């Protein structure tokens, strides 16, 4: 190693819930100071630098759409192995705003929100406030205030129909960095 003092001072923690992915990672990532965690409650009380490299876009999201001035939560209705469709059900957006503690619907017609993203950000920021540190988020996203539908399905490096290839593709979305900054306030 070119930086032995730095290497010896670092303790690497990898958050991974999947046993299969842990097995693959342990095979490919070697080091005595590496530990795998299933949740952030197992962190040490030490200064930490969190690196979220395409982490948040893998978390499940909820979508909300305003139609005729009424908010709806978007669901996927399974019809058969080869057919699904969107189903929009009326939703009281104030419930979501109570949860996030700000008016998320202000000047919006579409919202993508991940409850898990909010939870992880809160846990990470609590750790940073107590123990010092920082966070680097590396992901596809946008900074505009107006949220949009960014959900996408990718299979074999090509975009596919989200409703048709969900069992054989990577379903992801672009992060709203504006929303993340609002969650962090």
Regions picked out by a protein language model, each given a short descriptive name:
Residues 1-43:
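SAM cofactor-binding core of SAM-dependent methyltransferases
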Residues 35, 44-47, 51-185:
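Class I S-adenosyl-L-methionine
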């Amino acid at each position: 190693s070119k930086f032995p003092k730095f290497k010896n001072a670092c303790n690497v923690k990898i958050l991974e819930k999947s046993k299969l992915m842990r097995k693959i990672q342990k095979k490919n990532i070697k080091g005595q100071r590496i530990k795998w965690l299933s949740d952030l409650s197992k962190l040490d009380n030490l200064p930490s630098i969190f690196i979220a490299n395409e982490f948040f876009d893998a978390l499940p999201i909820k979508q909300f759409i305003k139609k005729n001035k009424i908010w709806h939560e978007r669901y996927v209705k399974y019809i058969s192995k080869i057919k699904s469709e969107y189903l929009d059900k009326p939703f009281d957006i104030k419930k979501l705003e109570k949860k996030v503690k700000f008016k998320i619907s202000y000047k919006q017609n579409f919202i993508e929100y991940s409850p898990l993203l909010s939870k992880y950000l809160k846990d990470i920021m609590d750790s940073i406030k107590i123990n010092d540190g920082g966070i680097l988020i590396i992901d596809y996203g946008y900074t505009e205030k107006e949220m949009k539908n960014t959900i996408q399905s990718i299979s074999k490096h090509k975009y596919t129909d989200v409703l048709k290839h969900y069992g054989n593709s990577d379903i992801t979305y672009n992060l709203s960095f504006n929303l993340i900054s609002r969650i962090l306030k």
